[in-house]
Curated annotation (Swiss-Prot):
InterPro entries on file: ACP-like_sf, DltC, PP-bd_ACP
GO terms of molecular function: D-alanyl carrier activity
Keyword Cytoplasm carried by entry: yes
Protein name per Swiss-Prot or TrEMBL: D-alanyl carrier protein
Stated role: Carrier protein involved in the D-alanylation of lipoteichoic acid (LTA). The loading of thioester-linked D-alanine onto DltC is catalyzed by D-alanine--D-alanyl carrier protein ligase DltA. The DltC-carried D-alanyl group is further transferred to cell membrane phosphatidylglycerol (PG) by forming an ester bond, probably catalyzed by DltD. D-alanylation of LTA plays an important role in modulating the properties of the cell wall in Gram-positive bacteria, influencing the net charge of the cell wall.
Gene: dltC
Modification after translation (UniProt): 4'-phosphopantetheine is transferred from CoA to a specific serine of apo-DCP.
Modified residues (O-(pantetheine 4'-phosphoryl)serine): 36
Source organism: Listeria innocua serovar 6a (strain ATCC BAA-680 / CLIP 11262)
Domain Carrier: start-end pairs: 1-78
Keyword terms, alphabetized: Cell wall biogenesis/degradation, Cytoplasm, Phosphopantetheine, Phosphoprotein
Length: 78
């Protein structure tokens, strides 16, 4: 499975909706799909499944607001 699809699969599991796959520009926090607990879960899953460590200092909610932005941020950290 390609990197992009892996990230979207993780997001779909955490948000419990396929809307994140259908609309990769959806505002995850504004729509209530991600909160602080789900964000922690997301970062743990990213590290576990993709072997990418996201330093807390690198996590800026504004830069991680949509699935597309998350993919871009993770690509930069690979």
């Amino acid at each position: 499975m390609a990197f992009r699809e892996n990230v979207l699969e993780i997001l779909e599991e955490i948000t419990e909706t396929d809307e994140v796959v259908q609309n990769t520009n959806i505002k995850l926090f504004d729509e209530g799909l991600l909160d602080s607990m789900a964000t922690v879960q997301l970062l743990i899953e990213i590290e576990s499944r993709l072997d990418i460590t996201v330093p807390v200092s690198e996590f800026d909610r504004d830069e991680w607001a949509t699935p597309e932005m998350i993919i871009t941020q993770l690509e930069a950290l690979k």
